[in-house]
């Protein structure tokens, strides 16, 4: 088999298995009891900032938990006075399904009524997630440009006062939370303060949204995405994180450190089938009459690279573009840039495809020219094969002499194609995990560029264009090898059936442009030869 044929087949196989290995969603896990947690790195101790001492308070009588609602332009959130915790949070600008009437995306749900997120534990102060707080208001509405506060207060029998203050802004998806702890008792108290995120292992929403669901932590300038199967042998602890939370393909809920407020994040799988992320602060030790405060920031929103970057703490690293991030990020920014002018992400994809094709035109022209020259040498190459069929070493020497005589590079037709492979995978990443394409319509029946073509029209047309492209490509292969290569469009078509229609659109437009390019290149070469 010729070198080009072998390389093409190997690349196709690598593409197929590489896609399966790199981009397939992880297998679903069956909940099992969690083993004892193991800490990977020691947590760094940070001294919490002192705050003014509050007036000594008396323990409040036991009361039933109730809900407190807050409404902002970006989200609506329901708190429970049990723990002063977030009970439910819905994103108002994003919906579960495309089209009108879709339900809002829910990032915090009521699936686990005994463990609301974000919960708070401070065992040394007698505080657990069942403690009932007193709210400063029963409801709150935050308008565009406004900033408002909501506080929850709890007093222990020993005189320790804990106040959770949420600071809301009407301009985004972030909010600030401050824990103020005051020792109004007569004895010294100390405790770690733990913020607890609890999520169901199997979300009770559309499953495809959670195909990349799992814990995500950024620490030591590295993104840790702990797999559920790895938590079977014990919890994972990451020291001094900048942020930690849970992410799926398009959305993120995270706790962000503020001035060293996070000593460690520990993710474990509970026996009841939940993922629990415990974010520990430095130990708080308070003498009588002393108070301290810890501040965090919370984010509940889309994995939009610009939105995440505005939050700081390297939150944009939650978008894991893998090895091709250096190429994928500029492509993602270009996609948004052209959308701002066209108002249609499908058209933006077409524009980017045309630009990429123009950039690579010199390489493409060189590739087709090399293949055309190799095709003209086929009769002489076949003669050498027959002449030296029993002496492979002599045949290789004769082939190299033939190439040198005619100034032909035998791999000249392949190398330009290899250069374009990283660009394809980078664009794959940018399109596959871009929230901008989620529920973004193109035209006609394609109403969601992040979903597959519901009628499989575009992947089938794409397969047809691959066949046409192969027919137009100068061939150096014998009939048997050509038949093998003709199977590739079938393989690719089946692979692309369930790909996002935005990615299929790119590949289809790329094939059409390649056919046009090939036609003009072949014609220009034929014209030059005629002269």
UniProtKB/Swiss-Prot annotation:
The keyword Protein transport applies. Its main location: membrane. It holds the Pfam family 60KD_IMP. Keywords: Cell inner membrane, Cell membrane, Chaperone, Membrane, Protein transport, Transmembrane, Transmembrane helix, Transport. It is found in: Cell inner membrane. It is a multi-pass membrane protein. Coiled coil: none annotated. One of its GO terms (biological process) is protein transport. One of its GO terms (molecular function) is membrane insertase activity. It comes from the Bacteria. The keyword Cell inner membrane applies. NCBIfam families: PRK01318.1-3, PRK01318.1-4, yidC_nterm, yidC_oxa1_cterm. Required for the insertion and/or proper folding and/or complex formation of integral membrane proteins into the membrane. Involved in integration of membrane proteins that insert both dependently and independently of the Sec translocase complex, as well as at least some lipoproteins. Aids folding of multispanning membrane proteins. Belongs to the OXA1/ALB3/YidC family. Type 1 subfamily. Interacts with the Sec translocase complex via SecD. Specifically interacts with transmembrane segments of nascent integral membrane proteins during membrane integration. This is Membrane protein insertase YidC. It comes from Geobacter sulfurreducens (strain ATCC 51573 / DSM 12127 / PCA). The gene is yidC.
